[in-house]
Amino acid sequence: MKISRSLSTVEVHTGGEAFRIVTSGLPRLPGDTIVQRRAWLKAHADEIRRALMFEPRGHADMYGGYLTEPVSPNADFGVIFVHNEGYSDHCGHGVIALSTAAVELGWVQRTVPETRVGIDAPCGFIEAFVQWDGEHAGPVRFVNVPSFIWRRDVSVDTPSFGTVTGDIAYGGAFYFYVDGAPFDLPVRESAVEKLIRFGAEVKAAANATYPVVHPEIPEINHIYGTIIANAPRHAGSTQANCCVFADREVDRSPTGSGTGGRVAQLYQRGLLAAGDTLVNESIVGTVFKGRVLRETTVGDFPAVIPEVEGSAHICGFANWIVDERDPLTYGFLVR
C-alpha cells in the first residue's frame, strides 16, 4: 500500500445532519481570506473533497468542513464548508457542530456556564456560544450573519409542478422559500423523493430566472437551495421545513442558515415579532430555534441579525487514507 495522503476527522451530527470536521492532512492553504483559500482548494485540491464526501467514505448527503487558521482577530479558527456538489458560503449546522467539538475537545478556552467560539467562514465572522457545565457541551446559539428578503412573491416554472411562488431570502446563503401544502409536500421522511424532485426543479428554475448577488459579498451569487415548509409533527414547533440544496442533497437538520433566512422572512413580513421565537423542525423531527436580535441593513436591503440555536453530538473519530492504486480512491456517487 502506498499512502499519498492521510486525513484525520472528527465525526459530528447536528440534529441528524452529518458534519465531518477535517482536523489534519490538508495542504497549506494560501490566501488572506477564507474565500481566497476556498478558491485555491477548488482549483488545486478538489480531490480531497471528493474523497471525503463521496462514497465509499461518504455518501450523497454528506457534509463537512476543513479547519484552517483564522483570518480575523476575534476568531479561534476558520472553516471551509464542503458537500457533494462543492463548497458553501455558510452552514449553520456546521457552526453548531464545530462549536460543540471545539468545546468538548478543548480547542478553545472553556468557561462555565457558557463558552464563546469565534469562527471565520466564507460568509464572514460568526460568533457562537456553547453551554458548558464543566463536563459536557449543551445547546449552541450563534449570531448569524445579516439576513434579509432579496425578492418577495417571485414565481418560477417547473417541469413537474407547474408555477411555484415564494420568496428568495438570505441567511448566509440564498434560498427559495416556498409553502409545500399546495403541492402536497409533507415534511416527512416518507415524502423525501418528491421533496427532492420538487426542490431540485425549483432551485434550477430560480437560478435560471433570478441572478442573485449579495450586495456586499459578490462571490455569493447563486441560489443554494429550496426550503419547503409545512405543518410540524411536534405540538411545540412553529413549522417543519425541508432544505434541498447542492446536488439534490437533503438536510436532516432544520438548516441553520435557512433558519436565519426564515427568521428574516417572517419578521419582514410581520409574521414574527421581536422577542418571539421560531421553533423550526426538520424532516426527522429535530429542532432549531431562531429569533431576531436586532435590525440592520445590507446594502439597500433592510435586514436583521438573527440568533439560531441547536445541538450537536460527536459520534466518532476517523483516519482516512488516499491510496493512488485504488481506482475509486477519490470516490463516486450512485445518486
UniProtKB/Swiss-Prot annotation:
This is Trans-3-hydroxy-L-proline dehydratase. Pfam families: Pro_racemase (PF05544). The gene is lhpH. Substrate binds at G92, H93, H222, G256, S257. InterPro entries: Hydroxyproline_Metab_Enz, Pro_racemase_fam. It catalyses: trans-3-hydroxy-L-proline = 1-pyrroline-2-carboxylate + H2O. GO terms for molecular function: trans-L-3-hydroxyproline dehydratase activity. Its EC number is 4.2.1.77. The active site is at C91 (proton acceptor). Belongs to the proline racemase family. It is an enzyme of class 4 (lyase). It comes from Burkholderia cenocepacia (strain HI2424).
